[in-house]
Regions:
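N-terminal signal-anchor transmembrane alpha helix of single-pass membrane proteins
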Residues: 1-31
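Contiguous beta-strand segments within globular domains
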Residues: 28-64, 90-94
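Extracellular Ig-like/FN3 beta-sandwich strand-entry sites
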Residues: 59, 104-110
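Solvent-exposed serine/threonine-rich low-complexity stretches and specific carbohydrate-binding patches
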Residues: 73-88, 132
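Short, hydrophobic beta-strand segments
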Residues: 90-104, 116
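Short beta-strand elements
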Residues: 117-139
């Protein structure tokens, strides 16, 4: 085998391994996402985010936003953060929204968890996504 053929075979094997990792193993996938209200505390509305991590979600990020249903251009976005510290299996996290930003009426809370990977470019091209939206009535 000459050098060019060896390079092409190695590159094809690495690409195939990356594709199989993304399509079959789905490392860091987060599923079973649910969101529930948990009351108010210290000027914040609390919501509990439940999810299941199939493996270490080192490159997963959670984002959440609150949208006013009466005025859809009014959106309150929470801070994007990593799920790097969570355990394999079922996990819970609190999402906090400042109450003084909310007006009475119907609101929509949307939570998105996106998993990418810096080692495998197929996760960047086709990230794993999970989301949940709930309707909330603010008094």
């Amino acid at each position: 085998m000459d050098g060019n053929t060896l390079f092409l075979v190695t590159a094809a094997a690495a690409g195939l391994a990356g594709l199989l990792d993304r399509l079959i193993l789905r490392r860091g996938q987060v599923s079973d996402v649910t969101v529930e209200p948990a009351g108010s505390e210290g000027g914040y509305r609390c919501y509990v985010l439940h999810y299941h991590a199939s493996s270490d979600p080192d490159w997963s990020e959670v984002t959440y936003s609150f949208r006013d249903r009466k005025r859809p251009t009014t959106v309150i976005t929470g801070r994007t953060r990593s799920l790097a510290g969570c355990a394999i299996g079922s996990n819970d996290e609190y999402l906090l929204i400042r109450e003084n930003l909310l007006t009475p009426g119907p609101w929509e809370l949307t939570v998105r968890i996106t998993t990418t990977c810096r080692r495998n470019p197929f996760y960047s091209l086709f990230p794993l996504k999970a989301s949940k939206t709930i309707q909330v009535q603010i008094q």
